Amino acid sequence: MTLSEAIRTMADEIVSVLAGNEPTIYIFGSVALDDFRPGWSDIDIAVLTKHEITGQQADTLVGLRQVMLERFPGNPYFRLFEGGMLSLDAFLSGKKERAVYWGTSGQRIDDSWKMDSFGMAELLERLKTATT
């Protein structure tokens, strides 16, 4: 499976879990900048939804990387996805609500998710472009 196929497969799974919540998936960082390097890069992802993620959705999403690794043994990409999933409102306002975090140190359900300033600038520019 190629990097592009892995991203599409993961995106399809996320959309399936968040059905009815109108998820928008953003890939940013080295993949978006065409600078992905196997063994060095991760796959930065932000998933923004119309409404707060439900407890059941969060429970499914928090373990999705592991599920995908079990389904596709030996795939080098699924463990590299890192980022957050939360409502667009919580992302923009910083309000506390259920969020899913995937990172190098593991994954968890939390009450917020913040991205680094470079990723934030890139994502806000994309949001601005998408809404104007």
Q: What do these predicted regions represent?
A:
Residues 29, 34-60, 83:
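Catalytic metal-binding acidic patch
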Residues 7, 25-28, 43, 65, ...:
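Generic, low-specificity signal for short hydrophobic/alpha-helical stretches with a mild N-terminal bias
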Residues 1-26, 57-58:
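Helical scaffold of the NTase/Pol beta-like nucleotidyltransferase catalytic core
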Residues 26, 36-39, 45, 87, ...:
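Generic detector of bulky aromatic hydrophobic side chains
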Residues 63-132:
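Conserved NTP/Mg2+-binding pocket subregion across the NTase superfamily
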Residues 19-21, 39, 74-79:
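Short helix-terminating capping/connector loops at secondary-structure junctions
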